[in-house]
A protein has these predicted regions:
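Short peripheral tails and domain-boundary helices/loops at the edges of structured domains
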Residues: 30-76
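Long, positively charged leader/targeting segments at protein N-termini
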Residues: 1-16, 20-29, 34-40, 78-233
Length: 233
């Protein structure tokens, strides 16, 4: 049976009752008081995010915010390498270690695409990931994750992350990210707990306040939302 317009598909709180983060966001990567504080201090001290490539326009019709993608990839790779000590261990342990992404193909595999536009796109994406990794390594030195770990994390972010304009961040949302596996994925919206946002709600200052206070949740509703999932792929 088809779902009705506005019906909730899935909803996830951004923070739990103790104000601890549930979602892994680019904001948390720079939060020196959060669970990623050790990484955040290094990222902020080295101004690492300013070294990334920013927003890149793509001939496929949508931009790639590589700064946010690389920032989130760094945090994800770090969490994987921390193992038992990772804050998001339960989440990262469930992520597949093989990602269906052209940027993960080796040269021999790409040769099979000879003559296709995909091969050039894959090469550009691989070069971009290498550039972002080199910026990471130059800033963090020996504390940087391995290139293979970073490359996997970057591909995972592009496959699963949501851009949340209302919270000005990109996020990996445990559970909800399963719906973000295609360009036509349902849209998402940021809501107050117990309150449904609509297009006529102009109380932007209040929206910022509830987001900062941890009273936000990300919800997928049929046909409703401000940010199309998958637009950063």
């Amino acid at each position: 049976e088809d779902m009705a317009q506005g019906e909730v598909i899935f909803s996830l709180r951004m923070r739990d009752d103790d104000d601890a983060p549930i979602a892994l966001t680019t904001t948390e990567v720079e939060n020196e008081r959060g669970p990623l504080r050790t990484l955040a201090k290094m990222v902020n001290a080295t101004r690492l995010t300013s070294r990334y490539s920013g927003v890149i326009e793509d001939e496929w019709g949508f931009p790639l915010d590589s700064t946010r993608a690389a920032t989130l990839a760094l945090a994800l790779a770090r969490e994987v390498e921390l193992g038992d000590d990772a804050y998001w261990r339960a989440y990262v342990d469930l992520l597949p270690r093989e990602v269906d992404s052209l940027q993960m193909w080796d040269d021999d595999e790409l040769e099979a695409l000879q003559g296709s536009r995909l091969i050039e796109r894959a090469r550009r994406r691989r070069a971009l990931v290498r550039r972002e990794y080199e910026a990471t390594r130059e800033a963090l030195g020996a504390t940087a994750p391995s290139y293979e770990s970073f490359r996997w994390a970057y591909a995972t972010v592009l496959a699963r992350a949501f851009v949340l304009p209302d919270l000005n961040c990109m996020a990996l949302l445990p559970g909800l990210d399963l719906y973000n596996s295609a360009r036509d994925a349902e849209k998402c919206t940021v809501e107050r707990l117990g309150h449904v946002e609509d297009d006529d709600d102009e109380d932007d200052d209040e929206d910022v306040a509830f987001a900062n206070e941890g009273e936000a949740q990300v919800t997928l509703r049929v046909g409703i939302g401000g940010a199309a999932a998958g637009t950063q792929l």
